[in-house]
Structure formats: structure tokens, C-alpha cells
Amino acid sequence: MDAATLTYDTLRFAEFEDFPETSEPVWILGRKYSVLTEKDEILADVASRLWFTYRKNFPAIGGTGPTSDTGWGCMLRCGQMIFAQALVCRHLGRDWRWTQRKRQPDSYCSVLQAFLDRKDSCYSIHQIAQMGVGEGKSIGQWYGPNTVAQVLKKLAVFDTWSALAVHVAMDNTVVMADIRRLCRSSLPCAGAEAFPADSERHCNGFPAGAEGGGRAAPWRPLVLLIPLRLGLADVNAAYAGTLKHCFRMPQSLGVIGGKPNSAHYFIGYVGEELIYLDPHTTQPAVAAADRCPVPDESFHCQHPPGRMSIAELDPSIAVGFFCETEDDFNDWCQQVSKLSLLGGALPMFELVEQQPSHLACPDVLNLSLDSSDAERLERFFDSEDEDFEILSL
């Protein structure tokens, strides 16, 4: 059966392959497990991640648009999953676990409501699709990892409850000074609309070099998304070690990407296989609920997750990290610096203190798709025209 036409009712969970009996550790978003002694703990961790899949019969996007995202929304759903993990870490903590038919904290309900399939949910398929129009994507068009990262960054501005600082690193470069400035800023962190068009260049929505007067503002929790291309047609095997190490970091949010025909949300690895949640299941939309509890069983994957060889991964991906505090960010920087010492491993991105003079401010390049730079970046990172195929209905 084609993955695009699977429905929740036709799934048989016994058909999903269980974890292999191996002495190799299983890593799930910064947590290490033994499949020989902790299989239940592994599955509980996986089931606690929010699982967003294709849905049908939701209110029409834009009032007259699609009522289902089957066949085109897989990367949007993966973007929802990686961002939902950031909100779970922000409001519930990495060690929170979901239990079926058990009342959850109100903050869990608020996180879930932010992703429901309705126009007034901050990170709904409706909001992502309509915000994507401003990025040059028509509703129903397939997204690549970079585009969905840019859209989520813009939507996060409206999520005042979470108050996240979202940084999308470009040109394979993470600039520490830019991130510290962003996380210490109380100004809008996406879009230059808050400033006059003829003002100085802006980084992440505030003037370059602007630190603000007086005492430093409190650190805002950071969501760091890094679009990458790890090869031309295939992933360069030299990146495998550093990619796997990303899942071992406690700040890990996982990876969005996939392989020809589909996009997945990768949450860990075992041996040379990546572990992922698959959005290619069509479920009925959950009726909008303004109060807790939200019917939530279909938002949690209650069967063993998928696995695929790293060699099968499409080279166009986006890696995510969450740093609740500045100490978390400093620790992440130290870990990344140590990656360069791994024998035979190729760094996936560069970590620098200051913006290199030959690079433009990364967020300026994404304020408008009229910019030739933005178009260049989208062609480089979003390989939907060549490496991905839209699933046929």
C-alpha cells in the first residue's frame, strides 16, 4: 500500500519492525538506552514525542483551499514535530512522559492546541501553509527543510507564551555572537517590519550590533535550526559520525529531512540506522477544542518507530537544537567544538564567534523571496525539484 494512502484505521501495528536485539546503544534525542534491558523505556520515550501526520477533513486552508494535506504536507508535519519537541522541552521538560488515558498538565494541552488543524492555532498546517505564501510557496506546494524552518521562525514571533528566540543558521555557519544578541533581545526576532526600510542592516529582526541599553535582558530559550546539505545526490559518508553525534547531545531536537518520496522526523539512531517518526499516515482531523483535554491518542506513535540506513538519507536536511539557558548554549558550543577532534569525521557546519566579513547577515537573505540571495539559498537547501518526489494520491 502506498504510504500516502495509509490511514490510521488500516494500520496494523504488529507489522512494524521492532528494535533489533543488539548491544549497540540506542540514542533518542540526547538519551542513551540499551535495547536489551530498556526496550519499554525506549518505546515510552518515542511515544511521548508529538507525532503529526497527514490529516483529512479539517477546515479549508484559507477558507477555500485544501481540507487535507495528504501527498504534500509531509515536510510541514515534520516541521511541526521538531518544533513541538522544542515546546515540550520549554514547557514540560525533556524527561516528561505521556501516558495513555492519564490526565496531563495544562501546559501539555496548550502545546498540543498550538498545532491543531485550525486557522487560529499558532503552528497549524493552516498557518504554515499561509505563511509559506509569503515565502513564494503556493498552498499545497511541497516544502524543503530550509523553507519550513524559515516559516516556523516567523510564526514563533506570535507565540508570546513560549517567548522563544528562533535562529535559522545559514551558509553552514553558526555565529555565536548573533545568537547571544538574539537571545538577549526583547525585540521581534523575525522579519524587519519593526524597523524602517532604510535603517541599518538587521540580524534576526534587530539592528546588527544592537545590544540595548542598561542591564542585559534575560536569556530567551533558543531554538536553533541549521539547514544543511551533506552531499550532492547522496550523503557524504564522512558526515555520518557528526550526524549521529548530534542525536547524543542533550540539546538535540532531532533532524528533519528524508529520502526520495518522503520526509521524516529523525529522533535518534542505533548502529548505522536512523530512527524516525513517519508522517505518511492519513488520520481524521481532531475537532477543535478550546479546553482540556484534547483527544490526543492519535498524536502519539504507539508502535515501534521507523528505521533507515544513514546512507539512504537525502543530503538536504535541517538539524535542530534547544538551549533553555545560556549555560545550555555554552555547553552546546563546547560539544560542537570537540566534534572537530573526531577522527575521520567531517564537521557538518562551522561554529564561529563573529559573523565572517564575506557573509551577509543570514536573516536578511530570507526577508523576501524577491532577493536573489534568498532564491539561491532555497535552491541549495530545498531539493524538492530533484531529490524529492511528491507522493501521488
Curated annotation (Swiss-Prot):
Q: Mind telling me how this protein is modified after translation? A: Phosphorylation at Ser-383 and Ser-392 promotes autophagy by increasing protein delipidation activity without affecting proteolytic activation of ATG8 proteins. Phosphorylation at Ser-316 by ULK1 inhibits autophagy by decreasing both proteolytic activation and delipidation activities. Phosphorylation at Ser-316 is dephosphorylated by protein phosphatase 2A (PP2A). Phosphorylation at Ser-34 by AKT2 promotes its hydrolase activity, leading to increased proteolytic activation and delipidation of ATG8 family proteins. Ubiquitinated by RNF5, leading to its degradation by the proteasome.
Q: Which InterPro entries match?
A: ATG4_LIR (IPR046793), Papain-like_cys_pep_sf (IPR038765), Peptidase_C54 (IPR005078), Peptidase_C54_cat (IPR046792)
**Active-site positions on this chain:** 74 (nucleophile), 278, 280
Q: Where is this motif: LIR?
A: 388-391
Which residues carry the post-translational modification N-acetylmethionine, per the record?
1
Q: What activity regulation does UniProt give?
A: Inhibited by N-ethylmaleimide. Redox-regulated during autophagy since reducing conditions activate ATG4A whereas an oxidizing environment such as the presence of H(2)O(2) inhibits its activity. The cysteine protease activity compounds is inhibited by styrylquinoline compounds 4-28 and LV-320.
**Which keywords, in A-to-Z order, does the entry hold?**
Acetylation, Autophagy, Cytoplasm, Cytoplasmic vesicle, Disulfide bond, Endoplasmic reticulum, Glycoprotein, Hydrolase, Isopeptide bond, Mitochondrion, Phosphoprotein, Protease, Protein transport, S-nitrosylation, Thiol protease, Transport, Ubl conjugation, Ubl conjugation pathway
Query: What function does this protein fulfil?
Result: Cysteine protease that plays a key role in autophagy by mediating both proteolytic activation and delipidation of ATG8 family proteins. Required for canonical autophagy (macroautophagy), non-canonical autophagy as well as for mitophagy. The protease activity is required for proteolytic activation of ATG8 family proteins: cleaves the C-terminal amino acid of ATG8 proteins MAP1LC3A, MAP1LC3B, MAP1LC3C, GABARAPL1, GABARAPL2 and GABARAP, to reveal a C-terminal glycine. (Microbial infection) Mediates cleavage of an ATG8 protein homolog coded in the genome of cytopathogenic bovine viral diarrhea virus (BVDV).
User: In this chain, where does the modification S-nitrosocysteine occur?
Assistant: 189, 292, 301
Q: What class of enzyme is it?
A: hydrolase
Q: Which cysteines does the record link by disulfide bonds?
A: 292-361
Q: Does the keyword Coiled coil apply?
A: no
Q: Which residues carry this modification: Phosphoserine?
A: 34, 316, 383, 392
Indicate the quaternary assembly: Interacts with PFKP; promoting phosphorylation of ATG4B at Ser-34. Interacts with GBP7.
Its GO biological process annotations read: aggrephagy; autophagosome assembly; autophagy; microautophagy; mitophagy; otolith mineralization completed early in development; piecemeal microautophagy of the nucleus; protein processing
Which molecular-function annotation in GO is an example for this chain? cysteine-type endopeptidase activity
- UniProt key word rRNA-binding: no
Q: What is this protein called?
A: Cysteine protease ATG4B
Q: What is stated about domains? A: The LIR motif (LC3-interacting region) is required for the interaction with ATG8 family proteins MAP1LC3A, MAP1LC3B, MAP1LC3C and GABARAPL1. Required for proteolytic activation and delipidation of ATG8 proteins.
Q: Which GO terms describe its cellular component?
A: autophagosome; cytoplasm; cytoplasmic vesicle; cytosol; endoplasmic reticulum; mitochondrion
So what does this thing catalyse? [protein]-C-terminal L-amino acid-glycyl-phosphatidylethanolamide + H2O = [protein]-C-terminal L-amino acid-glycine + a 1,2-diacyl-sn-glycero-3-phosphoethanolamine; [protein]-C-terminal L-amino acid-glycyl-phosphatidylserine + H2O = [protein]-C-terminal L-amino acid-glycine + a 1,2-diacyl-sn-glycero-3-phospho-L-serine
Q: What EC numbers are recorded for this enzyme?
A: 3.4.22.-
Q: Which compartment or compartments is the protein found in?
A: Cytoplasm; Cytoplasm, Cytosol; Cytoplasmic vesicle, Autophagosome; Endoplasmic reticulum
Q: Which domain of life is it from?
A: Eukaryota
Q: Which family does it belong to?
A: Belongs to the peptidase C54 family.
